[in-house]
Amino acid sequence: MRILWIVAVCLIGAEGHLSQFGDMINKKTGIFGIMSYIYYGCYCGWGGKGKPLDATDRCCFVHDCCYGRVNGCDPKMGTYSYSFQNGDIVCGGDDPCLRAVCECDRVAAICFGENMNTYDKKYMLYSLFDCKEESEQC
């Protein structure tokens, strides 16, 4: 399933909100976001289970929970409006659902930036099979 997700991200390219999320991550961390976080820990990328492994993985857990609260659109599809103003990410647009998705991504990008010191390369390409502890509630 993870291979399919990587292929989907590559096919999306510069279209869709995943590239927008990657741009936000890049602005807040200075690293290429999507590839650095897509399969990090137990929660970054498609799906998630178990307990977050560190603060970076917790950013993804909270992001997943945020997406779970979005109503009216698919959080992984569509394009939202946002801009960077004085180093801050500002979500805009008239569609309340896409604006909510943007806010989820904005908060996650900020979280990644604030927790870069917890990023551990051993959790890159981490297998969900190794996430065995009971999952937390959102």
Swiss-Prot record:
Localization of this protein: Secreted
Gene3D superfamilies named among the record's database cross-references: Phospholipase A2 domain (1.20.90.10)
One Gene Ontology term of the molecular function aspect: phospholipid binding
Binding site for Ca(2+): Y43, G45, G47, D64
Cofactor note: Binds 1 Ca(2+) ion.
Major place of residence: secreted
Keyword entries, A-Z: Calcium, Disulfide bond, Hydrolase, Lipid degradation, Lipid metabolism, Metal-binding, Secreted, Signal
Signal peptide location: 1-16
Reactions it catalyzes: a 1,2-diacyl-sn-glycero-3-phosphocholine + H2O = a 1-acyl-sn-glycero-3-phosphocholine + a fatty acid + H(+)
One Pfam family named in its UniProt record: Phospholip_A2_1
A Gene Ontology term for the protein's cellular component: extracellular region
Catalytic residues (UniProt): H63, D105
Gene Ontology biological process terms from the UniProt entry: arachidonate secretion; lipid catabolic process; phospholipid metabolic process
Enzyme Commission code(s) on record: 3.1.1.4
Disulfide bond positions: C42-C131, C44-C60, C59-C111, C65-C138, C66-C104, C73-C97, C91-C102
PROSITE patterns: PA2_ASP, PA2_HIS
Cofactor: Ca(2+)
Alphabetical list of InterPro entries matching this protein: PLipase_A2, PLipase_A2_Asp_AS, PLipase_A2_dom, PLipase_A2_dom_sf, PLipase_A2_His_AS
Function, in words: Snake venom phospholipase A2 (PLA2) that has enzymatic activity but is non-toxic. PLA2 catalyzes the calcium-dependent hydrolysis of the 2-acyl groups in 3-sn-phosphoglycerides.
Protein name: Acidic phospholipase A2 ammodytin I1
Organism encoding this protein: Vipera ammodytes ammodytes
